[in-house]
From Swiss-Prot:
Domain of life according to the entry: Eukaryota
Post-translational modification: Phosphorylated; stimulated by phorbol ester.
Biological processes, Gene Ontology terms: actin filament debranching; learning; locomotory behavior; negative regulation of Arp2/3 complex-mediated actin nucleation; nervous system development; protein phosphorylation
Record-given protein name: Glia maturation factor beta
GO molecular function list: actin binding; Arp2/3 complex binding; enzyme activator activity; growth factor activity; protein kinase inhibitor activity
Modified sites of kind N-acetylserine: S2
Primary role: This protein causes differentiation of brain cells, stimulation of neural regeneration, and inhibition of proliferation of tumor cells.
Organism phylogeny: Eukaryota, Metazoa, Chordata, Craniata, Vertebrata
Protein's gene: GMFB
């Protein structure tokens, strides 16, 4: 089984984009959506979005194809503080082709390590990506 697990590399320009994204100064929500180029076996940029809420973000995700998302979220704490956690979200909808799911699942950890992220979440249905869901997930870290 392990020999069929494909681990894709991360495109060089995407590595640089993720590094810059980590240190961005803007105070709005933003997302980098990534996909796998299966011929090149590379994780590549799909879209970059600024000023996007979790609910708007879910509308950008394909319902039948996996995607990786790095999301900078303006998190308002109960005590009034504001932070901007970087979240990694693996969208792996039910109904994806099994080989596609395997390729994404096999490449997820490498991408998380490359992007140096600790807040890693997974959704199986794009409808699950809501502000409430994200706040609940982030609540475990704060």
């Amino acid at each position: 089984m392990s020999e069929s697990l494909v681990v894709c590399d991360v495109a060089e320009d995407l590595v640089e984009k993720l590094r810059k994204f980590r240190f961005r100064k803007e105070t709005n929500n933003a997302a980098i959506i990534m996909k796998i180029d299966k011929d090149k076996r590379l994780v590549v940029l799909d879209e970059e979005l600024e000023g996007i809420s979790p609910d708007e973000l879910k509308d950008e995700l394909p319902e039948r194809q996996p995607r990786f998302i790095v999301y900078s979220y303006k998190y308002q704490h109960d005590d009034g503080r504001v932070s901007y956690p970087l979240c990694f979200i693996f969208s792996s909808p039910v109904g994806c082709k099994p080989e596609q799911q395997m390729m994404y699942a096999g490449s997820k950890n490498k991408l998380v390590q490359t992007a140096e992220l600790t807040k890693v979440f997974e959704i199986r249905n794009t409808e699950d990506l809501t502000e409430e869901w994200l706040r609940e997930k982030l609540g475990f870290f704060h």
